[in-house]
């Protein structure tokens, strides 16, 4: 069995879909369906069982046996970069992750987890080293702290001549694609611009968006990276982006091209995001490629075209 936490979320449900396409359906999805809209992400998927996050965590902490587990994809987290309740964030993204990690280490279960490019902050160098990290919000900090916890475990194991089972962290950059309808304000720019045009409006970007550049990565490619590391058993913390920085304007142009209508308009940059907003991200893929992962990443033009063909059918 494979367990996917956050399996009703955007990345988690796409990982389940990718596993299904690889002929794997012995899957336990763990999530919190308080946001009932997320159920739609599971409707077309083939899974063995579903479990509530709190019930799952209780069983993990009790050391319960789930039977043979091939791997755990840990995608469950509070991913709202605008959430400032630090106690809530650290409990969800840090403490919960530690419990699950040690459960896996004790049983030598491969543990593949979601980190984030939010760990980098305002740097212009996106290399998986501590000197380049400096989160701008508590979400990024929760992910940064868990990465550092994993690093300490590796260091301790090395000093004692021990070999840990697989731990692989993925620093997701700006992920977009199908199954993000439930995310509200946290959904991708492509999602919001598409909705605006479908509502008969012009697509709207924040002022300055022609110079805001992010590494936008298509969720289908993210899943390919996850499955490659499961298959190859490589440990480490790796950037998961395209290696390209493209502007928000490029995303808007791709959405306009899909619809063949709409003129890009600008709106004022919101005060609540000032100082907590990454204006530039670009994954350094040196470490990913050195590990042997040869997944090719779609450009914004390619990814948005595929996404909207699915979204608008």
From Swiss-Prot:
<feature type="binding site">
    <location>
        <begin position="75"/>
        <end position="79"/>
    </location>
    <ligand>
        <name>NADP(+)</name>
    </ligand>
</feature>
<dbReference type="GO" id="GO:0008712">
    <property type="term" value="F:ADP-glyceromanno-heptose 6-epimerase activity"/>
</dbReference>
<feature type="binding site">
    <location>
        <position position="277"/>
    </location>
    <ligand>
        <name>substrate</name>
    </ligand>
</feature>
<dbReference type="GO" id="GO:0097171">
    <property type="term" value="P:ADP-L-glycero-beta-D-manno-heptose biosynthetic process"/>
</dbReference>
<feature type="active site" description="Proton acceptor">
    <location>
        <position position="139"/>
    </location>
</feature>
<protein>
    <recommendedName>
        <fullName>ADP-L-glycero-D-manno-heptose-6-epimerase</fullName>
        <ecNumber>5.1.3.20</ecNumber>
    </recommendedName>
</protein>
<comment type="similarity">
    <text>Belongs to the NAD(P)-dependent epimerase/dehydratase family. HldD subfamily.</text>
</comment>
<feature type="binding site">
    <location>
        <position position="92"/>
    </location>
    <ligand>
        <name>NADP(+)</name>
    </ligand>
</feature>
<keyword id="KW-0413">Isomerase</keyword>
<dbReference type="InterPro" id="IPR011912">
    <property type="entry name" value="Heptose_epim"/>
</dbReference>
<dbReference type="GO" id="GO:0050661">
    <property type="term" value="F:NADP binding"/>
</dbReference>
<dbReference type="InterPro" id="IPR001509">
    <property type="entry name" value="Epimerase_deHydtase"/>
</dbReference>
<feature type="active site" description="Proton acceptor">
    <location>
        <position position="183"/>
    </location>
</feature>
<feature type="binding site">
    <location>
        <begin position="31"/>
        <end position="32"/>
    </location>
    <ligand>
        <name>NADP(+)</name>
    </ligand>
</feature>
<feature type="binding site">
    <location>
        <position position="38"/>
    </location>
    <ligand>
        <name>NADP(+)</name>
    </ligand>
</feature>
<comment type="subunit">
    <text>Homopentamer.</text>
</comment>
<feature type="binding site">
    <location>
        <position position="192"/>
    </location>
    <ligand>
        <name>substrate</name>
    </ligand>
</feature>
<feature type="binding site">
    <location>
        <begin position="10"/>
        <end position="11"/>
    </location>
    <ligand>
        <name>NADP(+)</name>
    </ligand>
</feature>
<dbReference type="InterPro" id="IPR036291">
    <property type="entry name" value="NAD(P)-bd_dom_sf"/>
</dbReference>
<feature type="binding site">
    <location>
        <position position="53"/>
    </location>
    <ligand>
        <name>NADP(+)</name>
    </ligand>
</feature>
<comment type="pathway">
    <text>Nucleotide-sugar biosynthesis; ADP-L-glycero-beta-D-manno-heptose biosynthesis; ADP-L-glycero-beta-D-manno-heptose from D-glycero-beta-D-manno-heptose 7-phosphate: step 4/4.</text>
</comment>
<feature type="binding site">
    <location>
        <position position="174"/>
    </location>
    <ligand>
        <name>substrate</name>
    </ligand>
</feature>
<comment type="function">
    <text>Catalyzes the interconversion between ADP-D-glycero-beta-D-manno-heptose and ADP-L-glycero-beta-D-manno-heptose via an epimerization at carbon 6 of the heptose.</text>
</comment>
<feature type="binding site">
    <location>
        <position position="143"/>
    </location>
    <ligand>
        <name>NADP(+)</name>
    </ligand>
</feature>
<feature type="binding site">
    <location>
        <position position="185"/>
    </location>
    <ligand>
        <name>substrate</name>
    </ligand>
</feature>
<keyword id="KW-0119">Carbohydrate metabolism</keyword>
<feature type="binding site">
    <location>
        <position position="175"/>
    </location>
    <ligand>
        <name>NADP(+)</name>
    </ligand>
</feature>
<feature type="binding site">
    <location>
        <position position="183"/>
    </location>
    <ligand>
        <name>NADP(+)</name>
    </ligand>
</feature>
<dbReference type="Pfam" id="PF01370">
    <property type="entry name" value="Epimerase"/>
</dbReference>
<keyword id="KW-0521">NADP</keyword>
<dbReference type="GO" id="GO:0005975">
    <property type="term" value="P:carbohydrate metabolic process"/>
</dbReference>
<feature type="binding site">
    <location>
        <begin position="206"/>
        <end position="209"/>
    </location>
    <ligand>
        <name>substrate</name>
    </ligand>
</feature>
<feature type="binding site">
    <location>
        <position position="214"/>
    </location>
    <ligand>
        <name>substrate</name>
    </ligand>
</feature>
